[in-house]
Amino acid sequence: RFFGWERQPGKDTIQGKLEAVLGELQGAPVNVIGAGRTDAGVHARAMTANVVLDTALTPEEIRDYMNRYLPDAIAVREVKEAAPRFHARYNALGKTYRYTCHVGAVKPVFDRKYVTLLDYEPDVERMRLAAAYLLGEQDFASFCGNPRMKKSTVRMVDHIGIEQRRDRVIFTFHGTGFLQNMVRILVGTLLEVGRGYWEPEYVQEILLAKDRKRAGPTAPPEGLCLMKVDY
């Protein structure tokens, strides 16, 4: 439906739609700053953003105005007055992502845009063993989708949960921050372990290699959702 968060000329993006509506409210262009840049196909239940507005409307009235004019696929849950120096991206202390896979021959018609389809049943216990090697502050260069990344690729991941609920395998990640496509590459790698292609211990070698080619594929965007941003 949208080409990700970040505004792009001639394309529908979340940032672009928010700025268009708020620009009409303000009567002048505005700059909406998000907590991150979700890719096309990725979802968010709790994206946080900040914007400077000069208006007499209350936060509730701003929320209602936005929800009246935004596309049906975008909803503003809450508007709050922030501190003058608040920055949705740089002030974030942590993020929680969820990745959902559907296992089975019957397609999930109503949820098809929010899950990734698997034609095999991954071994959850094997994936949990592999995930244990990914916890802590480590160099995740092998799990970075940007080959020209010049900044530090060291990140802290303090929780990886993997559970099976009937026909769903659900991954939950929490960390202080994530590299481009990092969560999707982590999922793609864990699924390779879950289907028996790699042993759980091989994840250690992938980390030490600091080479994107050693990790698994980038999992499709549909199953990924930003669940929470900590401040």
What do these predicted ranges mean?
Residues R1-Y231:
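Structured-RNA-binding interfaces characteristic of tRNA pseudouridine synthases
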